[in-house]
């Protein structure tokens, strides 16, 4: 297991189309920010994007910027800047990296797209379905830009999603409309709102089909592919362009399946990733698992942008239902049932949990879940200690040693 093996990673042609989509997205925001029109709304990644788009806003998602800070390995040097301002090193490193970057006047958008700064918001809209940190994050920028901040406060630890849950969230979403209309300078057109929700649903369905191709043996896609291909599902839901680019991706993946072509050469082990990616180690982790003929092919994280409950004929209630059924909002019992279904569907041999130091809401290995799931399914697991953005919290050598030992364990189980 310790012998190094050269790995040839198979790139998807349509990844280039998605890269162009993301470049166009950021350039459009930059131009609007400079001109002052169209107006720009900031939104959390699972926030009320459909309402914002229907009101004519361009929508910027700061979490994607933070992921870029992590992937470019800029974040580790920027987090201490926010820590010095009073933000604890234990809170979300998306927040601390992003605020640190703003204070220092740097952004990965400069090298990637020639863009000098993040876009100026006219309004910021959050949903705390991910965590409370997003509210603090947006409030900080609201003060800096003198822009209004509004949001939805979601229930936590939800078991069965009830009509009471849905009604409560739908009312909060409806209450956003009036203040957002004032900023937009226009009324919410319900026909346009329904059109946007329909496109968001179509994008979501295509993204699900993309991720579901990993159930094929061998899988035509990896989790690490998914973390970069998910861009349009996050920033582009509600747009035709996101739908179009995912149709191209899905066709390419289906062609791989038809040809028996796997993303990992000679795939032997199928791994489920539970938790956040380590953005600054995507390539290293992809190479590590592939060198062991292991494909990390499915995850809870990438599935977080599948919203099958969206219904253009009932936009507010269906948005409330979709965004409350989100995995991160649910109880441990609901999460465990979900993961068990995923393990069966993707024919998984082992689970890797990422215990992200600054993201407790996405670290589901702290209260006995790995042990309970292994007892129920017989599928072994490994926990990796690290973080989504702060590489000081990760030991590369320890991760490598533990992963190699885990794959050896899976090998021994096969006899």
Report the location of each language-model feature:
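An N-terminal, globular interaction/scaffold subdomain
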Residues: 42-117, 137-138
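Internal, well-ordered alpha/beta segment that forms a basic, Gly-enriched binding/recognition surface
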Residues: 101-213
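Short hydrophobic segments within beta-strands
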Residues: 43-44, 272-274, 354
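A charged, amphipathic alpha-helical module
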Residues: 2-39, 170, 174-296, 300-301
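TerminUS-proximal long segments
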Residues: 336-344, 348-350, 354-415
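Short, flexible loop segments at the rims of nucleotide/cofactor-binding pockets, characterized by
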Residues: 17-20, 98-104, 326-332
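Redox- and metal-dependent alpha/beta enzyme cores, enriched for Fe-S-associated oxidoreductases
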Residues: 53-83, 272-340
């Amino acid at each position: 297991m310790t012998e190094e093996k050269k790995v040839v990673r198979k790139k998807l042609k349509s990844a280039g189309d998605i890269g162009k989509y993301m470049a166009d997205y950021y350039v459009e925001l930059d131009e609007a920010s400079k001109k002052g029109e169209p107006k720009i709304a900031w939104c959390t990644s699972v926030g009320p994007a459909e309402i914002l788009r229907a009101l004519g806003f361009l929508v910027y998602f700061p979490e994607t910027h933070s992921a870029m800070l992590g992937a470019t390995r800029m974040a580790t040097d920027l987090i201490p800047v926010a820590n010095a301002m009073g933000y604890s090193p234990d809170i979300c490193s998306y927040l601390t990296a992003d605020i640190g970057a703003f204070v220092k006047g740097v952004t990965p958008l400069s090298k990637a797209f020639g863009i000098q700064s993040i876009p100026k918001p006219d309004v910021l809209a959050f949903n705390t379905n991910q965590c409370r940190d997003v509210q603090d994050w947006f409030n900080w920028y609201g003060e800096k830009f003198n822009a209004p901040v509004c949001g939805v406060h979601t229930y936590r630890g939800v078991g069965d999603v009830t009509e009471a849950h849905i009604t409560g969230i739908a009312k909060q979403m409806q209450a956003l409309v009036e203040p957002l209309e004032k900023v937009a300078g226009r009324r919410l057109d319900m026909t346009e709102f329904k059109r946007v929700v329909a496109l968001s649903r179509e994008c979501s369905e295509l993204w699900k089909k993309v991720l579901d191709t990993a159930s094929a043996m061998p899988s035509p896609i990896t989790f690490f592919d998914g973390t970069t291909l998910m861009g349009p599902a996050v920033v582009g839901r509600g747009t035709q362009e996101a739908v179009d680019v995912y149709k191209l991706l899905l066709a390419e993946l289906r062609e791989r399946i038809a040809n028996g072509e796997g993303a990992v050469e000679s795939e032997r082990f199928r791994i489920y990733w539970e938790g956040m990616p380590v953005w600054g180690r995507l390539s290293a982790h992809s190479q590590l698992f592939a060198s062991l003929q292991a494909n990390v092919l499915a995850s809870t994280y990438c599935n977080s942008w599948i919203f099958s409950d969206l219904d253009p004929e009932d936009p507010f209630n269906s948005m409330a239902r979709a965004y409350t059924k989100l995995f991160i909002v649910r109880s441990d019992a609901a999460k465990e049932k979900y993961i068990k279904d995923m393990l069966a569907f993707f024919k998984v041999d082992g689970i890797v949990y990422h215990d992200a130091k600054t993201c407790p809401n996405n670290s589901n290995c702290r209260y006995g879940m790995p042990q309970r799931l292994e007892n129920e399914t017989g599928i072994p697991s490994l926990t990796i200690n690290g973080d989504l953005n702060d590489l000081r919290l990760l030991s590369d050598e320890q991760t490598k040693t533990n992963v190699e030992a885990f794959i050896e364990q899976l090998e021994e189980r096969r006899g």
